[in-house]
Amino acid sequence: MTGENGILTRANDAKANTEQAEEDELRKLTQAEAATYLEEHEYTDVSGETITIPAKCAVSQVEGENTLAGGLVIIDANGNEWVWIEVPESITASSTTDEDIKNALISYATNYRSDYSDTWYEGCGLEEQEYADRYSEMLQSIKANNGFFVGRYEVGSFDNPVTGNDITRKAVIQKGAYPYNWVTCSQAEDLAEGLATGGKTSTLMFGIQWDLVMKYLETKGVSESELKTNSGSWGNYRDVEFQVEQGNKYAISTNWRLGEWNDIPANYTKPTFNTDGDGVLLTTRKELILNLLKKLYLLSIKMYNQSP
């Protein structure tokens, strides 16, 4: 009765499917609500904290996704999901110039900075002056708004996966999408810009923003070592084994060549691999986040106020 095909197992599966269906319905309702917001609007959570939400976006109605303390999720009118990365007001309070703001942010997230610098290079998808302008806008916006939004999932597409360069597929930030691969950096920048909504600016993430995401996760209880040294307890790495729920899709990579996509079978455990280029690629679903990044999956783009 309690085996793979037992009554209890089937009852648990039915419960999980019902809960997932209810959650999916709440996301659809939030998406519909987002379409009604033609301008920016204020949102105050249960603890009294207030944040400005972009036009064409609404705060998720799913339990646990509607507080700043827990990790605020918004859904836009296209169904894409974004997470708020808070930067405490005190960090940039005494900074006014771009250089001052940048240095303050670097100091705040210094444990994740290493020796990297945010430097323009040809082929990144932006011209040098455009890069400088966007970087300045980003810094000033973080100061004005005390944070920024990032895509909740890796950028993907519901169109059929490809084995070569093809940027005609519609890009989304939603669970269940195929990862958007086979693109150059400049093409990825174009796709990221196309995901902007509510009059905001969307680009690939600048280095300092990745550092700030890591710092944000640290403030939510993730240890520095898990973020910097060994993230195998929550990441999809070739040498890490973990359970993957049904409803996902997977494809095996062998010597850097991706095979066919298939549905995840029942009781599937992602195996370990010993060689670079071998592994499993998975569609973007919340269940794959395991036990740490319950709000953030793979981060690749961010959205901020263009004119704070």
Describe each region flagged by the PLM.
Residues 91-99, 157-163:
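Short, solvent-exposed loop/turn elements at domain surfaces
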Residues 293, 299-301, 307-308:
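Low-complexity Ser/Thr/Gly/Asn-rich repetitive segments
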Residues 88-92, 153-157, 209, 304-305:
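Acidic glycine-/aspartate-rich tracts in secreted/extracellular proteins
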Residues 78, 108-297:
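Short aromatic-cysteine micro-motif
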Residues 1-12:
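C-terminal juxtamembrane segment of a hydrophobic transmembrane alpha-helix
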Residues 14-38:
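N-terminal alpha-helical signal peptides/signal-anchor transmembrane segments
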Residues 38-95, 202:
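GGW-centered surface loops in extracellular recognition modules
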Residues 97-110:
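Short Gly/aromatic-enriched secondary-structure transition segments
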